[in-house]
Amino acid sequence: MLELFPSEDVSPLYFEQRLSRQGYRRIAGIDEAGRGPLAGPVVAAAVVLPPVFDLPGLNDSKKISAKLREKLFPQIRRQALDYGIGLASAQEVDGLNVLQATLLAMRRALDRLAQPADYLLVDGITPVPLPLPQKTLKQGDSRSLSIAAASVLAKVVRDRLMTTYDARFPEYGFAGHKGYGSAAHRAAIARLGPCPLHRATFRGVREYL
């Protein structure tokens, strides 16, 4: 089911509870991190939450501090019924386009679940191309706690990856900007040229190939 415009504010468990009453038992929230950066992968996460959990402060990962995301990360993994992480590389972003690479990362995250989901709650307006019942939610990471949990996992995993990549390519400062197009990052690309982590089709990179 495709939703183009958000409805009025409801409980952040409204969709999960409604679907549970309809008989769904493995409702996976899905979100991604890293569509916009000039470098690094797109990371997606799928999270199946239990009926009862305790994750204070859980919300859209972009609206909470890095410190709280790091605190929530192990709590979500511990309390979730299931979760999976999927990546699409910078080369796949270039070869497919960023939307298709994002959907690929989401499919890979779902493939990493121990048991298949029976319903998907997807952040955004583009369904995952799988034969599963699903609902897209614009601004879903602030409207569904399952999506919010996936948002946190995806963001933390991607930030940690970019910090690791900083050790391989320290001249670009990936640990600080995480691959986004900061002034310092753009200046480094102009000075040094792109590295293998950069997205060659993105403006701000392709000019220096």
Swiss-Prot record:
CC cofactor: Mn(2+); Mg(2+)
Gene3D superfamilies: Ribonuclease H-like superfamily/Ribonuclease H
Annotated disulfide bonds: none
Cofactor note: Manganese or magnesium. Binds 1 divalent metal ion per monomer in the absence of substrate. May bind a second metal ion after substrate binding.
Domain RNase H type-2: start-end pairs: 25-209
Residue positions binding a divalent metal cation: D31, E32, D123
Pfam families linked to this entry: RNase_HII
Top-level lineage group: Bacteria
GO biological process, one term: mismatch repair
Cellular component per GO, a single term: cytoplasm
Keyword field: Cytoplasm, Endonuclease, Hydrolase, Manganese, Metal-binding, Nuclease
Main location, first listed in the record: cytoplasm
Catalytic activity: Endonucleolytic cleavage to 5'-phosphomonoester
Subcellular location: Cytoplasm
EC nos: 3.1.26.4
Keyword Lyase: no
GO molecular function, one term: RNA-DNA hybrid ribonuclease activity
Family: Belongs to the RNase HII family.
Function: Endonuclease that specifically degrades the RNA of RNA-DNA hybrids.
Protein name: Ribonuclease HII
